[in-house]
UniProtKB/Swiss-Prot annotation:
Keywords of the record: ADP-ribosylation, Cytoplasm, Developmental protein, Phosphoprotein, Ubl conjugation, Wnt signaling pathway
Lineage: Eukaryota, Metazoa, Chordata, Craniata, Vertebrata
The protein's name in its UniProt record: Axin-2
Gene source species: Danio rerio
Keyword Phosphoprotein set for record: yes
Low complexity compositional bias, start-end: 305-323, 411-421
Basic and acidic residues bias locations: 388-397, 672-683
Gene field: axin2
Amino acid sequence: MNRTLTDPMVSSFREDDPRPPVPGEEGETTCHHPSKLAMMRPKDPVKTIMADLRCSTARRDEDGLGEPEGSASPDSPLARWTKSLHFLLGDQDGAQLFRAYLEREKCVDTLDFWFACNGFRQMDLKDTKTHRVAKAIYKRYIENNSIVAKQLKPATKTFIRDNIKRQQIDSAMFDQAQMEIQTAMEENAYQMFLTSDIYLEYVRTGCENPSHVNPNGLGGLKLVCGYLPTLNEEEEWSCNDFKAKALATVVGLSAKTLRSPPLRAVEALEKGYRSYRRSDPGNPNRFTSGYSFAPATSANDSEVSSDALTDDSMSMTDSSVDAIPPYKLGSKKQLQREMQRNMRMNGQVSLPPFPRTRRPPKEMTPVEPAAFAAQLIARLERLKREQETMSSLEERLQQIQEEEERDESEMSSSSASHSLPLLPPGTCEEDPQAILDEHLSRVLKTPGCQSPGLLRHSPRSRSPEQRPLPRGGLSTRSQSSSMNGYVPAKTFISRQSTKHIHHHYIHHHAGPKSKEQIEVEATQRVQCLCHGTSECCTAPYIRSRSLGRDQCASPAEVALGHSSTLSKRLCKSGEEVNMEGLENSLLQLPADSTDRSQNVWQWILESDRQTKHKPHSTQNVKKSHSLEPTRTHTWGGGGSSGHLRAHQPAHPFVQDPAMPPLPPPNTLAQLEEARRRLEEVSKPSKQRHSTSSLQRDKSHPVPVQNGSSAFPMDERKDPKKMSGCHSSLGSETVVTYFFCGEEIPYRRMMKTHSLTLGHFKEQLRKKGNYRYFFKRASDEFECGAVFEEVWDDCTVLPMYEGKILGKVDRMD
């Protein structure tokens, strides 16, 4: 009885079940051709062949019914070769046949390496030849980048190399490499060998060998080679009539085909074989690139007994059973569709289990409890550290956010307390004497007034004395006034005679002044005002050029060296100034309890208010000042700290009253600017001097009304030389060059003092072979300069007048 009918999994009868075997052939277990399984799993068809062979050689004792008669013979060698690679290599004939196939495929080194590893494992480690053999195996198969080395993992090759270098020879040294080569052969070469022409030819010739013939051998060979052709009645089949290339196919078992001669059946088989072998010869997996035919249900278990019109023969010739109508034999697509339908119909046929196509992930593999606990503890500790780090970062960010909010609230409260309301319009018309008294109260708030004779270091004044002091001078400065130094007591001081002009130039002969010197200078001027007599206010406004001259000046010269607000108020009033009014103002100094920032804002507002109410007689002077670039003075700075202040507003809407006012400034921005300026005050004096000098250098001098200048000739330098000189003082270097004869040069700022040719080449956008010429000062020619060619990348480029001037030409 068929195994399928007795299988407990298939207990019910179905119409699509395979038919029972022909009487007398019950011993041959029916299995599907491997081509059917190849359609189900096209990537592993040879394993299907192995499974079919195992099914073909199965014993009936598995079902508990005992062995059939004449089926107690052992398995044939051909059937064992298809079980696994070990059975194939364990047989001498199989190993030789497999080696011949590998030699044809040019990958015989894999088999030699496998046998070499087997032989090395059996060697004695104490023998001196063992080390030489291991080294020879390594050099022959692994070191020379052969086909064996390409199939090994890098870690395996590194392990073998290290063991050989350290002479740590072990019998299991090549086990991992042998396992990898064996796996590669099982997946590729072994599967291709089972479908190769060499193996099939050997199977065909093995049929005539008596050692391979047994009562069950034909069944096994039939399954390996394919289905036998249909024989006509009263004819005997022989091996000579069957060709080696006749593999599995489906031949329509119609009445016409059954009555055809054997030659026609063989031709149909050859046609099917050509379609099966259609593949790329360069493809290493040729056995999976084609397709094979599924067996028809009517051809599984029986042959045609006679040509009589019986139920059996009618069922064999019925096209509904064969699933291939006679008129569709030539259509390949139709054959494929019918094969797939037959495969679905015969899907319940019991077949031996085949390996899973997908392996479970590594996480699902069973692990030792101790190793699993160690991995779990390590992961939990890592997670705990990450959570603690994130929590600490969140706490820190929250603290920083709270501190910022607290600082913003404090800043807003301080700005609200320091902000001054706009002065009412009525205050603009107040008495000039009251304004003078208020300004002097801020300037003279120092203990130095109590002892005029001593040069004490007074505490820091509340007025913004650290602001860079603009230069100024009298427009009607004459020889008589400078020689005599005195004028009659009853004279009028007009606006034109006391107008101050801004000159932002550097006194190179005067070094930077410290904070103590600035305070001493201010104290001297204040003390002179406090100790002055009737001669103090009658002297003209004579300025000193430096701190030394200021200290050596006469009391009459220093008397009027106070803030420019006094001179402007005197000019604005246009009235006679007597000493009695000045003494009264000095005696009536009110106490100022406001802080520094409030004084600064009040001082700025007063300056703006004073400028707005100037008469029209000063418009000519304003026009001359409008030519000067407007800029805002910084609070810090040295070098010119000895100059007195003159209220020349730097804002355009103050210079031109007709211009609409700018939007009100932001309080927070003003506080930030004030903080920055106070920080600049605390910087070293040298740095403040260079910074203030660079800032004042950008402006140009304005001549006074009588055509004379308030500065000597040595300070009026060429603007080009001045810009070049001060650019070298900064942290950037000006680089100007002509590129390949272009008319317009290129100019760049490089943040370095010593620029090399290599750095210069890196800045060029276009790369190529060029010649580089740079201008430098030279006395060889009348022009005083030459273009010097530079070749070495490490050479520092020469400078000309504080700049680097170069030309880049293409190399011929």
